[in-house]
Amino acid sequence: MEDRKLEAAESLALIGRMIENTRSRMVRNSGRPLLAWGYATVLTTFAVWGAVLYFQNPRWNYLWLMLPLLGWLLMWVSREKKPEGEVRTFVDRVIGNVWTVMGLSAWFVSMLALFTPMRLPILFIILLIMGMGTTVTGLIIRFTPTAVGGVAAIILAPFTLIAGNMWQPLLFIAGFVVMMIVPGHILNYKSNHPAR
C-alpha cells in the first residue's frame, strides 16, 4: 500500500473498520478474561472473608496475594491458540494499556493496604478502579453489557464504605459478578451463537 494522506471520510472509515475488527475479535476473546478475573476475584474474596471470620485473625487478609496468581492461572488455562497472522490493532493496544494502568494501580493500592499501616478502604478503591476499567473497555468496544456492568460497579463502590464489615465483601462480590462475570458470559454466548 502506498503512503498517501487519507481524506477525512477515508480516515473515519478506517477507524470505524479498526473498531469493528477489534470488536468482533473482542466478542470472541473478551469473555475469557472477564470470566477469569471475575471468578478469581469472587473465589479469593470468599476465601479471605471466610478465613477472617472463622479464625478471627486479620492476617488471613494476606490471602489476597493469591488473587493475581489465580487470575493469571485461569487466564493461562482458558487461553486459546492465536490464529496465524492475527494483527493487534491500535484499539487492542489501547484496551491493553487501559488494563495495564488499572491493574498496576489496583496492585499498588493493595500493596499499600497490606504492607503499610495505612487504613485504606481497599474494597471501595478496587471496585472503583476495576469499574472504571470495565466501563472504558465497554465504551471502546461498544458493548453495552460491559459498559453498564462497569457503571454498576462504580455506583456500588461507595456502598462498601457505609456497609458494615459483614456486608462489604458481599457488595464487592456483587460488583464483580455484575461487572465481569455477567458480561463475560454474555460475550461468550454471543461468540458461540453469532447473529444470522
Please provide the spans of the model-predicted regions.
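Selected alpha-helical membrane-embedding segments in polytopic membrane proteins
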Residues: 25-112
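Membrane-proximal helix-loop-helix units in multi-pass membrane proteins
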Residues: 90-150
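Terminal transmembrane helical module of multi-pass membrane proteins
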Residues: 136-196
